[in-house]
Amino acid sequence: MLYRIPVSTVGYWHSPWQIHQFLLPIERFIHRNPMLQLDPISKTTHQHSGHKGLVMAIGGAEDKVRGRQILTTFCQRAGGLDAVIGVIPSASREPDAMGRLYHDIFRDIGVREVDILLVGDRADAEQEEMLARLSRCTGIFMSGGDQLRLSALLDETPLLYQLRHQVWEGKSILGGTSAGAAVLGECMIASGGSNEAPNRSLVDLATGLGILPDVLVDQHFHNRNRLARLISAISAHPDKLGVGIDEDTCAMFEADGTLRVLGRGSVTIVDPRDVSYTNYAHVDVNEPLSIYNLRLHILSDGDCYNLRTHQVQHKCILPPLN
């Protein structure tokens, strides 16, 4: 169960970071105490029957200079030369510079129209002009940075509602790298440690954007030794599928329910469906976790995972471009 503390309880502060700084200790306490029942999210909030638009979750540090395999694929799937790419650089501490970086990359790849959607505060995400610009986009790209900042800016705003609608209805494809990938689930990893055995204190969880409600994403995965923290997160939310994505690697969530791997690293699937026992509810926060029958897959470029049947396929055939 995931719980939300409504932003309205603290009002609109000058900075979304202040909101999350205020809420983070509360969210940590709630996520480490699953028996608490504070304002549970309505099941209808993120309920959908599957997304018709491609979602590309990138593990960060994607190639921006040479082959640009992942970013080129994103542009191709968004419509090629005729694509309209909207860049949301709001997770970055320097959103203007980040926006210009991806603007120049996508233009260099060949996209004629790239729009930088600067969301500096929650009021920006409510403007009709911003919604109109988003509605024209065939591809939407969320940059890296701080996933807490991005979530604080977009969560429960008209911009997020429209973004989800466009992706779920197949009107746009969505790409997110690093923090932009971490926010895709209903629950997201806000921060955490590494180089430890899985335990309840290893990861801090927060509310994501709910674009892929059944998935919990981690990024820079093997590069930063994050398997233990993803397992710790999945132990707290065994109804989610853990997806750990390496740098310069992409998990492509296709409309047909296939997860396809693209890039030079790997994607790790942590599947808790068959877990028969965990001591999660019975140990102190710093004690190691026991988890029985946790299933793990490591997939490389071209491999696929069926999100409906939970079967893996080696080097599956690429679909035609949209």
Curated annotation (Swiss-Prot):
Protein name as annotated: Cyanophycinase
Main EC class the enzyme belongs to: hydrolase
Catalytic reactions on record: [L-4-(L-arginin-2-N-yl)aspartate](n) + H2O = [L-4-(L-arginin-2-N-yl)aspartate](n-1) + L-4-(L-arginin-2-N-yl)aspartate
Organism name: Thermosynechococcus vestitus (strain NIES-2133 / IAM M-273 / BP-1)
BP-aspect Gene Ontology terms: proteolysis
Role played: Exopeptidase that catalyzes the hydrolytic cleavage of multi-L-arginyl-poly-L-aspartic acid (cyanophycin; a water-insoluble reserve polymer) into aspartate-arginine dipeptides.
Gene3D superfamilies: 3.40.50.880
Keywords attached to this entry: Hydrolase, Protease, Serine protease
Family assignment from sequence similarity: Belongs to the peptidase S51 family.
Gene Ontology terms, MF aspect: peptidyl-dipeptidase activity; serine-type peptidase activity
InterPro entries (alphabetical): Class_I_gatase-like (IPR029062), Peptidase_S51 (IPR005320), Peptidase_S51_cyanophycinase (IPR011811)
Active-site residues, record numbering mapped to chain: 178 (charge relay system), 196 (charge relay system), 220 (charge relay system)
EC number: 3.4.15.6
Alphabetical list of PANTHER family matching this protein: CYANOPHYCINASE
Top-rank taxon, per record: Bacteria
